[in-house]
């Protein structure tokens, strides 16, 4: 009787594992998370807040994950070539961002590398499109959907998880940009 139960349990585990693996391989090879908001400010008021990593602490939800994380800035002061690295024992992990393209005031493209808690290499992109007296501001992240990401996608809705952070960040940017005109350097720590 115990032998039969053990066999049934093993078979159920194998079938469950096979099901998870089949679901994982059926997931797309790339991912994209994107959120958009409308900001009552011109692109040239929003752009400096994004193109200068020193000012991200004023609006990025990721900056609040671990106030004690180590931050390093290198490369250009802002815009193309600016580099921001972080190292955290907490939720923020360890990673690096480098602005690879920043045609003012329409777009900022960032090479985004995570090293901890898992390694991944993606692209983050901010687009600023004037729409009359407002700016349509889009924050996107995209890249390869590796096998571990496909498996995680079965159990967690990554779009909702990351998208919620993007919505918070965009709302913070909107609030900052709709205030009096500011210079991103005034918000530096």
Where are these regions (language model features)?
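Beta-strand/loop substructures that line and gate deep hydrophobic ligand-binding cavities in soluble
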Residues: 4, 101, 111-167, 173-175
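Hydrophobic ligand-binding cavity/cleft-lining segments
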Residues: 4-76
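Short, surface-exposed coil-to-beta transition loops
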Residues: 32-34, 92-97, 119-125
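Generic structural detector for well-ordered beta-strands
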Residues: 36-40, 85-87, 98, 109-111, ...
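Sec/Tat-exported extracytoplasmic proteins
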Residues: 50-60, 88, 166, 170, ...
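Extracytoplasmic/periplasmic/luminal assembly and interaction segments
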Residues: 52-101, 151-152
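N-terminal post-signal-peptidase region of extra-cytosolic proteins
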Residues: 70, 81-84, 110-113, 123-124
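Short, highly charged C-terminal tails/helix-capping segments
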Residues: 71, 174-189
């Amino acid at each position: 009787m115990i032998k039969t139960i053990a066999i049934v349990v093993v078979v159920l585990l194998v079938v469950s594992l096979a099901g998870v693996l089949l679901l994982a391989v059926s997931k797309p090879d790339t991912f994209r998370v994107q959120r958009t908001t409308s900001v009552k400010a011109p692109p040239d008021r929003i752009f400096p807040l994004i193109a200068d990593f020193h000012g991200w602490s004023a609006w990025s939800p990721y900056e609040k994950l671990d106030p004690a994380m180590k931050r390093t800035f290198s490369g250009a002061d802002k815009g193309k070539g600016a580099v921001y690295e972080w190292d955290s024992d907490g939720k923020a992990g360890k990673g690096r961002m480098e602005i690879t393209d920043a045609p003012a005031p329409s777009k900022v493209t960032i090479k985004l590398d995570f090293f901890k808690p898992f390694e991944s290499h993606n692209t983050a992109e901010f687009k600023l499109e004037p729409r009359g007296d407002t700016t349509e501001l889009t924050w996107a992240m995209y890249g390869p959907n590796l096998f571990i990401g496909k498996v995680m996608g079965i159990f967690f809705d990554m779009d909702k998880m990351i998208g919620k952070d993007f919505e918070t960040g965009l709302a913070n940017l909107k609030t900052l940009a709709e205030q009096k005109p500011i210079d991103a350097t005034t918000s530096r720590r």
